[in-house]
Design a protein with these regions (language model features):
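Solvent-exposed, amphipathic alpha-helical segments
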Residues: 15-22, 65-76, 107, 164-172
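Amphipathic alpha-helical packing segments from all-alpha helical-bundle domains
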Residues: 96-103, 118-144, 156-163
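An amphipathic alpha-helix signature
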Residues: 91, 95, 128-140, 183-194, ...
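Short, basic, alpha-helical segments at the C-terminal edge of helix-turn-helix-like DNA-binding modules
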Residues: 5, 30, 60-67, 72
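Hydrophobic/aromatic-rich alpha-helical bundle segments in the mid-to-C-terminal region
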Residues: 109-113, 121, 139-192, 201-203
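Hydrophobic alpha-helical connector segments
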Residues: 57, 71-101
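N-terminal intrinsically disordered/low-complexity leader segments
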Residues: 1-4, 201
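Helix-turn-helix
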Residues: 11, 15, 19-53, 57
Length: 203
């Protein structure tokens, strides 16, 4: 019986992913999802209390990955800024971006292009503001740890950098860049970003 329940849940998740990608959150109805899953509408609600709850379950691995990237890079227990000088830093950052896109491509498309009307519709704006605060706090922490680190950057410039990251993701996804081209674009982005930050921080 438990196996049947697990299989049913997987069918619902698979069918709803396809429908959300095709029609968007607003266009896909719970009736559509139930029909595509081979379950009754009432049974669908047994597994997920609402369409929004189902949408959030589908996208949670992707949103968790983005939150994790922020915490690892700029959280209070994240990287020390001195790591930016290591030769391995650029490759590590590139691998992190590539990994998120490879593992969560369809979910990122839903999050960035198909989430209108859901509780995740404003995720991009929420994340940009959170990342801006996080990076500013991280810079303050780094200045207390490294007495020779003396540079100023405006809050809005940090905000723009976070917006730029999402623009990069959106363009890669919108144009369905193949893996090799995605890697080349991300390599240029990471190189450009690191050269700029090193110049600004005089390191």
């Amino acid at each position: 019986m438990q196996t049947l329940k697990t299989d049913t849940r997987k069918r619902i998740l698979a069918a709803s992913r396809n429908l959300f990608l095709e029609k968007g959150f607003q266009g896909a109805t719970t009736r559509d999802i139930a029909c595509a899953s081979g379950v009754t509408l009432s049974n669908l609600y047994h597994y997920f209390p609402s369409k929004d709850a189902l949408f959030r379950v589908l996208l949670q691995p992707a949103t968790d990955a983005l939150e994790g990237l922020l915490a690892e890079r700029h959280g209070q227990t994240g990287y020390d800024i001195a790591k930016i000088q290591e030769d391995s830093y650029a490759e590590e950052e590139l691998d992190e971006y590539l990994g998120i896109i490879r593992r969560h491509r369809s979910s990122l498309k839903m999050l960035l292009f198909k989430s209108q009307g859901s509780s995740l519709e404003g995720f991009k704006e929420y994340y940009v503001e959170k990342a801006t605060r996080c990076v500013l706090d991280w810079f303050k922490l780094m200045k207390t740890k490294h007495s020779g680190m003396d540079f100023e950057v405006s809050d809005f410039f940090i905000h723009l950098n976070n917006v730029w990251m999402f623009t990069l993701l959106e363009e890669i996804l919108m144009h369905d860049l193949p893996d090799e081209e995605t890697r080349a674009v991300l390599t240029d982005y990471v190189r450009f970003e690191l050269i700029g930050w090193k110049k600004m921080m005089k390191i």
